[in-house]
Amino acid sequence: MFKFHQMKHIFEILDKMRCLRKRSTVSFLGVLVIFLLFMNLYIEDSYVLEGDKQLIRETSTHQLNSERYVHTFKDLSNFSGAINVTYRYLAATPLQRKRYLTIGLSSVKRKKGNYLLETIKSIFEQSSYEELKEISVVVHLADFNSSWRDAMVQDITQKFAHHIIAGRLMVIHAPEEYYPILDGLKRNYNDPEDRVKFRSKQNVDYAFLLNFCANTSDYYVMLEDDVRCSKNFLTAIKKVIASLEGTYWVTLEFSKLGYIGKLYHSHDLPRLAHFLLMFYQEMPCDWLLTHFRGLLAQKNVIRFKPSLFQHMGYYSSYKGTENKLKDDDFEEESFDIPDNPPASLYTNMNVFENYEASKAYSSVDEYFWGKPPSTGDVFVIVFENPIIIKKIKVNTGTEDRQNDILHHGALDVGENVMPSKQRRQCSTYLRLGEFKNGNFEMSGVNQKIPFDIHCMRIYVTKTQKEWLIIRSISIWTS
C-alpha cells in the first residue's frame, strides 16, 4: 500500500517531468498511465496476480513513440471517472430512472449476415412484463459507415419503437474523432494487420459502450450482437446475485463463449472502460477481461450453468468467416436456478485434493470429487433451518469422466437435528429413492414427506472401484 509521503514524492517527480521537451511527452504519458493503473487497481485490493503483473511489466516496456498515444491516454488521469466522449443519440428517450440491469451490445456492419435485430428481439421476448421494467438495452452502432448506421436505426425504430419510447432501448454512436489511430499497430501474436485493426477497434468500441452505461443501472451484462437469450434470464441473474450477497466478485459468467454473458457491477465499468482503452492494441477483448478480473483480485472464474445466452451467428463480424461456436450448456426454456438454502456439508469419503463437498452444492461450475466410495459412505447436507422441499436433483459424473458416477446409491431426507462432538446431524432418515444411471431427480417432495426437512444425505449402497464426482446438488423450496 502506498503511503501518502511516497505518493507526494511521486507526484513531485511527475510534475518535474512535465517540463521536459515535447519529444518526451509520450514517454512521460507511458510512465504515468502505468503508475495510475497500479494506483487504481492495486491500492484498493490486497494483491495482484503474478500473471497480471507480468502483463503490466511487458506493456510498460513497449516504446511509446507516436503522437497517437497522446490522444488515447490524455483522459486516464482518473480511472474512476468517465472518458470524455460526446455520444450521438441515434434513437433514445431520456432515461427517467436507474434500472437494475443494463444489457450492452456493440455492432458493426458484417460482410455476411446481420443478427442484431434478432438479438434485440430475443432480449425483449424472453423477458416478462415485470422484468422489462428493470432492464435497459444500449446498442452501440460502432461502424463508421453512416449509411449503414442510418439503415440500422430505421430498422430498429420500426421494430422496437415502443421500447424506445418506454426508455428501455437506446441506440448510440461514438464518433470516429474520439478513436485512437487504428492503422500500423503492433502485430502481437503474429496476427495479420487487418485482424489487429479489427480487434483493436472492437476493444475501443466496447470501452466507449461501457463508459456510456456506467450510470444507467446497478449491474451490466455484456453481449454480442448475434445472441439469443434464455427465458426469464433476468430473474435467473437476480437470483444468482442474491445468493452471492456478502461475497466479493468482479465478474460473473453466464456463458462459456468469449465475452458473451459477462456480468459486472456498474461501479466497475469506468475502470474497465479505461482498461480496455489503455490496452486496446495488446490483445482481444475477452483476454483483457480475464486480466481485469485478476487485477481486481478475483482469482477464479465464477461461471453458472446452464448458460443463459447462446451464440447464434453463423458468419463472424470479422471478414464474414464461418463461426459455428455453440454453448452446449445453454438451455433456452424454463431456466430455473435452484434455491439451495444455507447449509453445512460433510462426507466421510476420501476427498481428492481440493474438490471438497461444498463444491457440489454451489451453482458455480465446480464439483465434489472423491476416491472410490464403500458401502455405508455418506454425503450429508444439514440445513441451517428446517425447509420444505419441492424438488431435488442430483447429478454425478461429468462429460469427461462419465464413469465417475454413483453406481449404487440412495437419497434420504432427515429430521431432528442432534448436536454431536464433531458436527450436527439428523437422528432419523426416510428414504426417498434410488439413484439411476448416476442421477436422482424427484418433484413434489413436499407432498410425499410429512415433516420439515433438516438434513439430506446421499447413501452409498454398494462399494465401487470407480471414483465419484458429484457434479451438482439442486434443491428447490416452497
From Swiss-Prot:
Gene Ontology CC terms: Golgi membrane
Similarity comment: Belongs to the glycosyltransferase 54 family.
Glycosylation (residues): N84, N215
Described function: Glycosyltransferase that participates in the transfer of N-acetylglucosamine (GlcNAc) to the core mannose residues of N-linked glycans. Catalyzes the formation of the GlcNAcbeta1-4 branch on the GlcNAcbeta1-2Manalpha1-3 arm of the core structure of N-linked glycans. Essential for the production of tri- and tetra-antennary N-linked sugar chains. Does not catalyze the transfer of GlcNAc to the Manalpha1-6 arm to form GlcNAcBeta1-4Manalpha1-6 linkage ('GnT-VI' activity).
EC number: 2.4.1.145
Gene name of this polypeptide: MGAT4C
Reactions mediated catalytically: N(4)-{beta-D-GlcNAc-(1->2)-alpha-D-Man-(1->3)-[beta-D-GlcNAc-(1->2)-alpha-D-Man-(1->6)]-beta-D-Man-(1->4)-beta-D-GlcNAc-(1->4)-beta-D-GlcNAc}-L-asparaginyl-[protein] + UDP-N-acetyl-alpha-D-glucosamine = N(4)-{beta-D-GlcNAc-(1->2)-[beta-D-GlcNAc-(1->4)]-alpha-D-Man-(1->3)-[beta-D-GlcNAc-(1->2)-alpha-D-Man-(1->6)]-beta-D-Man-(1->4)-beta-D-GlcNAc-(1->4)-beta-D-GlcNAc}-L-asparaginyl-[protein] + UDP + H(+)
Principal subcellular localization: Golgi
Protein name (database record): Alpha-1,3-mannosyl-glycoprotein 4-beta-N-acetylglucosaminyltransferase C
Keywords linked to the UniProt accession: Glycoprotein, Glycosyltransferase, Golgi apparatus, Membrane, Metal-binding, Signal-anchor, Transferase, Transmembrane, Transmembrane helix
Tissue: Expressed in heart, adrenal gland, testis, liver, brain and fetal brain. Not expressed in pancreas.
Subcellular location: Golgi apparatus membrane
Membrane-side (Lumenal) residue stretches: 45-478
Pathway: Protein modification; protein glycosylation
Gene Ontology biological process terms in this record: protein N-linked glycosylation; viral protein processing
Cofactor(s) in the UniProt record: a divalent metal cation
PANTHER family per UniProt: ALPHA-1,3-MANNOSYL-GLYCOPROTEIN 4-BETA-N-ACETYLGLUCOSAMINYLTRANSFERASE C, N-ACETYLGLUCOSAMINYLTRANSFERASE VI
Transmembrane segments: 24-44
Cytoplasmic side: 1-23
GO MF term (any one): alpha-1,3-mannosylglycoprotein 4-beta-N-acetylglucosaminyltransferase activity
Membrane topology: Single-pass type II membrane protein
